[in-house]
């Protein structure tokens, strides 16, 4: 709770800025629904803070381009840097570039590989991925009665979130009451709706039998749903789960197509990242790992989340 309050309650202090502060922001990509909400959350929050300006860049899912952006931020003398990493295994060089210039850096949403060895003026703001896939798979297990066959759609394998959410699935089905569930296919859809649809089309064409689809995010889950419906699948007899609770996912749940998702507070992470960056720029202490909780979303409580992401 202490960590959450640090990220979310600091706004009462930060609104009194008496000088201009420039924060460079490098997003992994602009053409991603969840990351768009995250980016908008940062920009909308910054507008409420006097003298705070964000310079937001699109890395276009290119690691080299993102490192270039970090180097340019350093050269331009920004007060702090926020990074949503393209590749979480490639963050050490970014940390080194910022540290060499003594510019604070905050990673947001995707856990950097060097998270446990970050310099004192660097931090990580996100949600704990040990919760996301666990909440999703536990609910799907419940809906399946603890037995059956599942397909797993993984995000980009270069992202720690994809690896962790997939491991969560394995951990849940490795224990009672879910040991009767087996994985028949597990492939990456790179977080993309189109790739989720293509994978599902291929699985259906191959005649693979399954009872549920477990996706690392909502976009791939929606793609799978589109392919299932195009093939004439009765969605009332199919279980599909995702993560993020995006507006499109909630619409799919209302339509009876998506059974489970997990709310990841994109705007909260964005605000927490800006708060952490400003505090570090002012020489204030920030915990190096700031977590915003995940929350399970089902048809039973969907009304509580319709206006959130």
Predicted features and spans:
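A residue-level marker of the well-folded mature domains of exported/periplasmic proteins
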Residues: 3-5, 18-309
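Bacterial N-terminal signal peptides
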Residues: 7-15
């Amino acid at each position: 709770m202490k960590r959450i309050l640090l990220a979310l309650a600091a706004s009462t202090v930060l609104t009194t800025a008496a000088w201009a502060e420039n924060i460079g922001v490098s997003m992994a990509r602009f053409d991603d629904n969840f990351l768009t909400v995250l980016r908008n959350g940062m920009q909308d929050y910054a507008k409420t803070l006097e003298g705070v300006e964000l310079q937001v860049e699109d890395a276009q899912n290119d690691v080299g381009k993102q490192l270039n952006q970090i180097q340019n931020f350093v050269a331009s003398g920004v007060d702090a840097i926020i990074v949503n990493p393209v590749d979480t295994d490639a963050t050490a060089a970014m940390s080194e570039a910022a540290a060499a210039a003594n510019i604070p850096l905050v990673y947001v949403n995707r856990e950097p590989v060097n998270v446990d060895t970050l310099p004192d003026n660097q931090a990580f703001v996100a949600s704990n991925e040990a919760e996301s896939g666990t909440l999703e798979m536990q609910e799907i297990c419940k809906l399946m009665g603890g037995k059956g066959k599942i397909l797993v759609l993984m995000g980009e394998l270069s992202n720690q979130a994809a690896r962790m959410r997939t491991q969560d699935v394995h951990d849940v089905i490795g224990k009672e009451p879910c040991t009767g569930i087996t994985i028949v296919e597990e492939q990456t859809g790179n977080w993309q709706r189109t790739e989720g649809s293509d994978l599902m089309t291929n699985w259906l064409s191959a005649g693979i039998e399954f009872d549920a689809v477990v996706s690392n995010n909502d976009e791939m889950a929606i793609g799978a749903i589109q392919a299932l419906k195009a093939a004439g699948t009765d969605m009332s007899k199919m279980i599909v789960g995702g993560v993020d609770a995006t507006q499109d996912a909630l619409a799919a749940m209302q339509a009876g197509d998506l059974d489970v998702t997990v709310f990841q507070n994109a705007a909260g992470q964005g605000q927490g990242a800006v708060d952490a960056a400003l505090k570090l720029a002012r020489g204030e202490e920030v915990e190096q790992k700031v977590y915003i909780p995940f929350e399970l979303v089902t048809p039973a409580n969907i009304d509580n989340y319709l206006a959130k992401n």
